[in-house]
Amino acid sequence: MTAKDILFDAEARAKLKVGVDKLANAVKVTLGPAGRNVLIDKKFGAPTSTKDGVTVAKEVELEDAFENMGAQMVREVSSKTSDVAGDGTTTATVLAQAIYREGLKNVAAGARPIDLKRGIDLAVKDVVAELREISRDITGKKEIAQVGTISANNDPEIGELIAEAMDKVGKDGVITVEEAKGMDTELTVVEGMQFDRGYLSPYFVTNSEKMDADLEDPYILIYDKKISNMKELLPVLEKTAQSGRPLMIIAEDIEGEALATLVVNKLRGTLKVCAVKAPGFGDRRKAMLEDIAILTGGTVISEEKGYKLENATISYLGQAASITVDKDNTTIVDGKGQADDIKARIGEIKGQIEKSTSDYDTEKLQERLAKLSGGVAVLNIGASTEVEMKEKKARVEDALHATRAAVQEGIVAGGGVALIRAAKALDATNPENEDQKTGVDIIRRALEEPLRQIVANTGTTDGAVVVEKVKNSEGDYGFNARTEEYMNLIEAGVVDPTKVTRTALENAASVAGILLTTEAAITDIKEDGSDMPPMPGGMGGMGGMGGMM
């Protein structure tokens, strides 16, 4: 076992604080509209320029192991806030640094760390309740655009694009961010349900120019097994041919005789047909087939449910206004399913998302939800250089997360004002003793820190003066760092999602509390290279090879 180095009490906390400060100081220069960029060296390729707090935090790795522990604890604040709310990572880091700094002063003065932490937790609980109280719901496209603009570092183009995307696919719709081929940033929307399976044979194509199959007002056969025998498929084919409408077949696979017969019928013009494999795998495939059935008003023909393919009738088939199939994707537009059934299915998937503990499962469930809700929007991000494109793409992803957070829990005044307004809730907090009261006061002071830092980053105004002026005013009145004027921030579009502000404070207090109650720190002792064992012998005589030259 490797030997360990241990530091205790004040010495340990001092080392941890150095690490906390190094990381926080690198991150907090990015805060607010006047925040600066941070340049990050990459082993391969050009350096990355970013104004995203969590990206900076993830790059910080310190040489001193004890300092590094402090830095990594605060990095956790940033990462967790990003995971939950998608934005507010810099605010969370600034709050964590302030709470730890103020807490350490009081620990050094003799306060009990455990009571300080209890006071901090009490205060945070009351401030969060007040934030929820002053929060207001997002009502329209304009407010969505404002949130997107702020989170994308005051880029109105990105804010407008996100608002447009949400308008097109709904608040539950899937919006993906991709790199564009050119310099323009644009929005494309895929209407209806799309899944990544193309036609099983190019002979199904109806438009040879576009190389896709277009089916108007088709019936849809949904089967959860392979189809290789034509005999079991024949009854439903005959019934569809009599109706004169096209047929779309979605099955685990179609092969051999069955596929050949479908192709022949299509080429002869007997039946307009197209076949694709079912999307997904395993249990997810079953769920997606059920989604398609509900969307189109059909039934999944499954022997598990007691249905057999040879007994299938027209009533088992789904219907849609149109289906387009290319070599990679199938898009079902305007499925004819019952609105109540689709609504119930959406509710069921939302319930699964809430219970899900896996990020991957949550992502897949959200994709299914969007496909049922009405489409997928793709934001194609363009830029002149790869460095700019990556930076812009990261900003768009942040803005998208923040906008979703705003839709979930509403918005509060931005610019650090909401935290200062929420501090009034601390007047009613009931700490049990003097040290807990000190913990409450630590939070009261820390809540001012984001505004101080936003002002400090402008480089032109004194933070203490601005904080006092904002504290002495009411409502949404605050300092707009972009124009360096005092105004109603919500009317000016300077807003933050409540979820982002709340999560930043909760995570900052949690990690700062752990650091304050730390009494010892343990790390591996670095091994010196001089202690390495000597190279094994046995290669003697190599010196004589000089004569071979």
UniProtKB/Swiss-Prot annotation:
Which Gene3D superfamilies does the annotation name? GroEL (3.50.7.10), GroEL-like equatorial domain (1.10.560.10), TCP-1-like chaperonin intermediate domain (3.30.260.10)
InterPro entries for the chain: Chaperonin_Cpn60_CS (IPR018370), Cpn60/GroEL (IPR001844), Cpn60/GroEL/TCP-1 (IPR002423), GroEL-like_apical_dom_sf (IPR027409), GROEL-like_equatorial_sf (IPR027413), TCP-1-like_intermed_sf (IPR027410)
Record's subcellular location: Cytoplasm
Repressor as a keyword of this entry, yes or no, is no
Listed disulfide bonds for this chain? none
Q: Name one GO molecular function term.
A: ATP binding
Q: What is its EC number?
A: 5.6.1.7
User: Could you tell me which Pfam families the record lists for this protein?
Assistant: Cpn60_TCP1
Q: Which residues bind ATP?
A: T30, L31, G32, P33, K51, D87, G88, T89, T90, T91, G415, D496
What protein family does this chain belong to? Answer: Belongs to the chaperonin (HSP60) family.
Question: What is its biological role?
Answer: Together with its co-chaperonin GroES, plays an essential role in assisting protein folding. The GroEL-GroES system forms a nano-cage that allows encapsulation of the non-native substrate proteins and provides a physical environment optimized to promote and accelerate protein folding.
Supply the name of the protein: Chaperonin GroEL
Q: What is the scientific name of the source organism?
A: Prosthecochloris aestuarii (strain DSM 271 / SK 413)
Give the gene symbol.
Answer: groEL
